[in-house]
Amino acid sequence: MITKIRLQNWKSFKDSTIYIDSLGILIGTNASGKSNVLDAFAFLRAVGDGKSLLDAIQTVRGGEDWIIRRGENTFCIEAEIETEEGNFILDLRVIKKDSGFSYGLCEIHRLGSITEENVPDEFTDSTRNITWKTYNIPSSMDFWSSLYATLRSI
């Protein structure tokens, strides 16, 4: 289950954190960002479904023209995910260059486990245009299945 989501330069959000319980209700005036929060979940789900970075961006209302806050060239979605193996942080950063979205970096680590001494396992998925860095992550398929199931259940 996702227990917290932080949006940086995502659509209309400069830097906002939303805490999530088992029951969540979004309330706000018109144009306050409710749909933009839902778009963030749709984007995470698309990444969890295995879509390429560009395809995941295209699932969001407004596509690449509206996904990053005006005047910025990068956005970040950070989700705290609770699994049977513990709590983890998924930190997804995307950089836009003049030629389009060229780079995604997804870091996954156990909550509170990153130190300067940690060296991540790193691999690049060139078909999806995302580099993955993992820190102290269980290598079991159960963990990865649980993580992707959480993202797909959004």
Residue spans of the language-model regions?
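N-terminal pre-Walker A segment at the start of P-loop NTPase domains
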Residues: 1-13
